[in-house]
Every structure is written in C-alpha cells, then in structure tokens.
Swiss-Prot record:
Entry protein name: Transcription factor SMP1
Bias kind Low complexity: ranges: 115-127
GO cellular component annotations of the record: cytoplasm; nucleus
Disordered: region residues: 97-142
Keyword Phosphoprotein annotated: no
Coiled coil: none
Self-association state and partner proteins as the record states: Can heterodimerize with RLM1. Interacts with HOG1.
Length: 452
C-alpha cells in the first residue's frame, strides 16, 4: 500500500514543520550512509536548520572533502538545481463537501426500458451543484415487474418483495400514491426536503404493507370472542368426529357406568392445563387439575346389552373387579390329582433344612414331614402341601413340600428360576410327580422334627 502524494509547498504550521524536518533529515542521512557503503563513494551532507544549527554527515573527513571540492578545478562538477525537479505551483484546493457527496450518493438511476436496466440522469454535476435538483422516483406499474422504485434503488432498478405475485403488484400499484407535495414542475424535488420525503414514503410503504396484511383470510374473531365466556378452547378447531352418530345406551347401563377413568387409563380433558397454569387467551383465567382416581367396584346388570363399545367397557370392568379380588387375598393354587399310578418316576431330590447339615441322616414319618418346614436346594420358593387329596385342608405356611395320596408320596417341584409374580395355571408353574420312595424310608435332615 503506497503513500499518498502530498503537495510540495512550505508548511505554515510550526509544529508540523518541525516534525517534518526531523523525519526527513533522519531519512536523508540514512540514505546518504547507505549510498556511501553500497557504492563506495564519499558523501558530505551539510544542513543549516531554521534555528541556525548545522547538521552534517560525511563519510570521510569533512575538511578534506571541502578543500578538494573548492580548489580542484580539474574535477567535473555535476550541479543539480531546484528547477531540475520542476516548479511546484500551488494547485487549486479540492474541497470535499459532505452535503454534495450525500446528494451524489442519493442520485436516482431511472430505468431506461422495461427490462430493468438503469441509466444515469442527464443532468451533469454542475447542474446538480448549482440547482440541487434530483430526479424524482418513478412508480413501476408493469405487471411483470412487481415492485416500487425507491430513491435508494441500486443498479438493477426495481426491488421485488418476496412472496409477491401479479395480484399483489396490481393492488400495490392501485393503492400506492406518489407524494406530490415536494415535487416541482420539472419532475424533481429540492434536496432540502429530501429527508422529509423519504420519511413520508417509508410511512406510506408501511401503510401499504399493513393493508396487505389486513386483507389476508383470517377466521372471524368477533364470533369466537363472543362465546369466550365458557372455556371451550377446542372450538377454534372443531373436530370432524363431533357430527358422527353416537350409539344409544340401554337404560340399565346409563346410571351405573361412571366416567371412563381407572387405574390403567388417565383421562385429561382437552381444554385442561396439566401444569396448573391459567389460560389468558380471552381475558379470563382458569386453572385445571387432573388427578388420577380409582373408582370402586361397579355392579353390571347384564353384559350382553348395548353396542360393542359398551360390551368392551363391561368386560374391562369385570376384569378389573376380578383383579382386585385376586390382589385382595393371598395368592393360592388349586391342584387336582385324580389318582396315583405305579409307574416309575424320577426320584425327588433329598430335602435339606437350612439349619441342619446334609450329612445328617434321620428317618421321619410322612406326618412328621408334612408338619415340618422343608425347602428344596434347587429353589427357595414356597411350597403348598396337600393331605389325602383334600384341596380345602391346605398347609398355607408356605414351607411344606410333599403330600400323601393313596399310600403314595408326591413332591411338589417348583420351576427352577424366578417364581411367577401372579398365580398361574399348575401346568406352567408347578410339576407334580409321584415318588417310589416308601413312607417308612423317607429321609429328612430337620433336627427339630426328627424323632428322639
């Protein structure tokens, strides 16, 4: 980046003159030294300052160099005078007027044809400076050019608004009115009224845009606000299912069916606010709270009445009542053993107690084993004991693991793994098989129930 050229003339300011002298003197001495070293020449520089001070630089002895310069006439002298560099005459000052620069920048480029190309105004710079006139902005009424030219239009003329079409262009051209207050007969306005005209035009553009926004299709808010006394906010977007025919319910089910809420389904109204905040759409503030409620057992008279949705609801209520009845009491298991067979079966593993050692071998009777607490080493789940195929006489202590039916001993073997959470069918939860072990030879390691 080069330095700008300055005008060579005497500096009138003392401070600027002193600074310029110091800088240029140092530069001159530096160049003289570089020249003497690079080119192997003798250089002597003498400067007499304005303060009557000599500033000298010499690559050799100054007195010897001056003696040779004055006395030796045989040496040629190449003398350069100030006229060899040209006569520096003061040029006319270039005055930068900010007001004129703004006028030139705001000059309107008028479109020469419908294609949008622009040409510079025919007025020259002298007429602009003398009269201060600017060409007036012209409204573009072409159907293919959707936009209005402004005083700050760039090189391609019209400015198109995004989303505008031919109908927007026709509406804008019909509603837009040029401001004629500041225009003169020559089709231009004075520069003094430039700012006011621009502000007025900006206000007019905002009014056009506001009118365009008002013409958009919107729902009738007056009818909606008139019915805003009750909080039916879903009426803004009506559901298409409201007009469908609804099935009729029999008279026996109308009084017994509550609102469809259970421990499995949580129903929240469409116009409720789950967070507990209020709606301020129409000025009123209402808060809604959705709580999960479990209704008591419902008595259904007849499950075959009513349409299919009602039957599904009745089935759901029956299932709910059944689950509540099961969960209210202890889990139980019904096991039916028709008769004992003499087929050879897998022998049951030995029963060990948690307190006794497996090495202890103590004989026990079936009655003692039924009364004892036993568990299988394969699983820590609880067993249910039965006697004489009687399902009502149950050992419900959860520790008995055998039964005595028709002189045969049966063991209840639970599945290996995690026991079921809810009672299931016997075929999938417990396997029952007879044992060929005689009742007199049964082994038990329970030290507390063993005979003395």
């Amino acid at each position: 980046m080069g330095r700008r050229k300055i005008e060579i003339e005497p500096i009138k300011d003392d401070r600027n003159r002193t600074v310029t002298f110091i800088k240029r003197k140092a530069g001159l001495f530096k160049k003289a030294h570089e020249l003497s070293v690079l080119c192997q020449v003798d250089i002597a520089v003498i400067i007499l300052g304005s303060n009557n001070t000599f500033y000298e630089y010499s690559s050799v002895d100054m007195s010897n160099l001056l003696n040779v310069h004055q006395n030796n006439t045989d040496l040629p002298h190449n003398i350069i005078e100030p006229s060899d560099y040209g006569d520096y005459v003061k040029k006319p000052r270039v005055v930068l007027n900010e007001r004129k620069r703004r006028r030139r920048r705001a000059t309107v480029l008028q479109p020469a044809s419908h294609s949008g190309s622009c040409t510079v105004s025919s007025q020259d710079s002298s007429s602009v400076q003398n009269n201060g006139n600017l060409s007036a902005p012209l409204a573009s009424n072409d159907a293919g050019n959707a936009g209005v030219s402004t005083p700050l239009v760039h090189c391609h003329g019209a400015i198109s608004r995004s989303g505008s079409n031919h109908s927007d262009c026709a509406r804008n051209s019909a509603d837009y009115q040029m401001l004629q207050g500041g225009l003169n007969s020559g089709g231009s306005f004075h520069a003094n009224d430039y700012k006011e005209s621009v502000d007025q035009q900006h206000v007019a553009n905002e009014a056009i845009h506001r009118n365009f926004m008002n013409k958009r299709i919107r729902p009738d808010t007056h009818l909606l606000l008139s019915e805003s006394n009750h909080s039916n906010y879903h009426n803004f977007y009506p559901s298409p299912y409201e007009n469908l025919p609804k099935p009729s319910l029999p008279a026996s089910l109308v009084g017994n069916i509550p609102s469809f809420q259970s421990q499995f389904v949580q129903v929240i109204p469409a116009n409720s606010n789950p967070m507990g905040k209020g709606f301020n759409g129409t000025g009123d503030s209402e808060s809604f709270e959705a709580k999960q409620k479990i209704h008591p057992t419902v008595a259904i008279s007849n499950t075959l009445e009513g349409p299919a949705p009602v039957q599904a609801m009745v089935h759901h209520l029956h299932q709910l009542n059944s689950n509540r009845g099961k969960l209210s009491g202890k889990p139980y298991l019904k096991l039916n053993i028709p008769k004992a067979t003499n087929d050879a079966c897998q022998r049951s593993p030995a029963m060990y107690s948690g307190t006794a050692s497996p090495k202890t071998d103590v004989q026990a009777t079936p009655n003692q084993m039924l009364a004892s607490n036993m568990s299988s080493p394969l699983s820590r789940s609880k067993f249910l004991g039965f006697k004489n195929n009687d399902m009502d006489d149950l050992y419900h202590n959860g520790r008995c693991g055998s039964t005595y039916v028709n002189n045969k001993t049966f063991f209840l073997k639970p599945p290996i793994g995690r026991p079921p959470k809810f009672p299931k069918s016997p075929s999938s939860s417990i396997v029952v098989f007879p044992s060929s072990v005689a009742s007199s030879t049964l082994k038990s390691t329970s030290s507390t129930n063993s005979p003395d």
